[in-house]
Amino acid sequence: MFNKILIANRGEIACRVIKTARRLGIRTVAVYSEADANARHVRLADEAVLLGPAAARESYLVADKIIEACKRTGAQAVHPGYGFLSENEDFAEALAANGLVFIGPPAAAIRAMGSKSEAKKLMGAANVPLTPGYHGDDQTPALLQQEADEIGYPVLIKAAAGGGGKGMRLVERSADFLDALASCKREALSSFGDEHVLIEKYITRPRHIEIQVFADTLGHCVYLFERDCSVQRRHQKVLEEAPAPGMSEARRREMGEAAVAAAKAVGYVGAGTVEFIANQDGSFYFMEMNTRLQVEHPVTEMITGQDLVEWQLRVAAGQPLPLKQEQLEIRGHALEARIYAEDANKGFLPATGSLIRLQPPGESLHVRVDTGVEAGDEITPYYDPMIAKLIVWDENRDAALARMRQALADYQVAGLTTNIDFLSRLVACPAFAGADLDTGLIERQRDFLFPAVQPVPRDALLVAAVGELLWEQHEARQAARNSGDPWSPWHARDGWRMNLAAARSLSFKDGDTLIDIRVDYRADQWALSLGGSTTLARGRKLDGDRFAVELDDRRLIASLVAVAERRTVFLQGGTYTLLRDDPLHRVDAGDSQGGGLTAPMPGKVVALLAQPGQRVEKGAPLLILEAMKMEHTITAPTAGTLQAFCFAVGEQVGDGAALVEFVAEA
């Protein structure tokens, strides 16, 4: 076994590998960019080496720097995690050339599976079922369109070197093909350095089922059963589970044996995942093989009781697989939800910012949290916006779903927008709860998953007011203690006014709605008036930002996180955001809107889709912004004239930067 390994990655997967390595007595070396100098994986590792600037292409993707870090620290092997260089055959070969072990498959296997078109040919020869499609080398747009027309729409255009949902476009009709092809090629070139694409028939209501395989250097290969990853947004997984609901033993064996055949066809070693598209009639087709550990590997660990990172380390050290196929068994059901900094109501737009509060549910036999961040850390635009993976396990799917619902309700994040509320709706969705799964579930269930924005409920508003009053009292006491006259009445925050009732107003904004709560101070409580009715309230600070609240005869526990004027209320599993409004600083914003469209996040302009001076209709695409390795099309908010672009192709833009000068039609 190794004495020291280097982890060529960051975030939660680096922390995950460190955890197992530490248990096995293996020392770890972290690598980091300037943006990650204080990251959790750097703090957890025994040693850490700076690679370079924040941009991945100048740090985490520079193989020579990683090899040099190995030499400087004496690391014997490199665990690539997932993403970055994990599926780069040149990196694997470079490590071997420098006497270092790549904790992953042979370079030849990565190369064989790295090209989707080549992989399809190999799988066909190994009798692994294939989807109808075009996997040829001729990339002439006219030929590709002809092939798509012959396959029949809908078709899926996929980057041949792709993965992770990037470089994929669904095309419903021939007229849209060339635009989708151009966009797909741009994204493929940006993400993978290769614009080669393939085309496949798109199966209506498919399920995405993948098989975890493992092979050693002694010729043994097993499958550790399946994961259902059908719930996706933008072709990226959101919620995964194992085993797949409704999977029969016969079908599980058939898919598992097909996955093992796929692995053996390329001389595979280590952890790999063979992904299949499964039809509603029970047929299944090879999609791709990911030659690395998957993000969702924890659900497999939970149902098998195996540590897959330990398996990786043992196999890379030349040891045999820990178990044979007949020794592996499924126990219970596991679910994994990916907690992202993103706004589900804005097309899952990635978010950035500081994790002012980060309180995951407590871990136990049933609940696991894999994360690479802690409270106070920043989610930056440079890397994937994942905050954590929330994994639950129980004896059956219904019990696991109940665990997930509670764990999501207990998850508290403040400082930026997350998808936690969306995930809560997803696990409560009747279609998901009933295992009516396919990759279009989120789109099919839009009405349930994306309800109209509701106003912050009355209880949350009253709790916010109580939290504000308690905080004011706390500040007043602190000021009194620190003053030369602690008994001065001027320190009191009790609403006292000469010759008037002790009362005041607290003002908040819920979106664009202004909310005034009248506070009447009583001897040991407040009378809070809102919307024509009055509630008697008491409050008592607990630990941190938690406090106990009494609203008439009801007792609640809540938290209030305040950053500048932003207030985040955590109450009974819900998260509510308000702005503290100061009447003395109100301005009329009615005419403050400029004539430009702003960047929803930091990114790079990759295409301009209109001409200055051109009249456009509402929804017309104006430009494409690339952020976090995804393309985002900026469209006209209304009919009008594009006056000018503020940036050229290739230029970086900041969050909120004006992108175009636009004049709306009257």
Language-model features: where?
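N-terminal beta-alpha lobe that positions the nucleotide/phosphoryl donor
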Residues: 1-274, 278-297
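Short amphipathic alpha-helical segments
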Residues: 3, 166-167, 243, 384-390, ...
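Structured, non-catalytic alpha/beta "coupling" segments that mediate domain-domain communication
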Residues: 77, 87-94, 336, 346, ...
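Catalytic cores of soluble metabolic enzymes centered on carboxylation/carboxyl-transfer
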Residues: 259, 298-533, 651-664
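Conserved nucleotide-binding/hydrolysis modules and their immediate coupling elements
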Residues: 307, 520-546, 550-556, 565
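Long, charged amphipathic helices and adjacent flexible linkers at domain junctions
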Residues: 323-331, 446, 450, 574-599
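Structured functional modules or segments
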Residues: 587-666
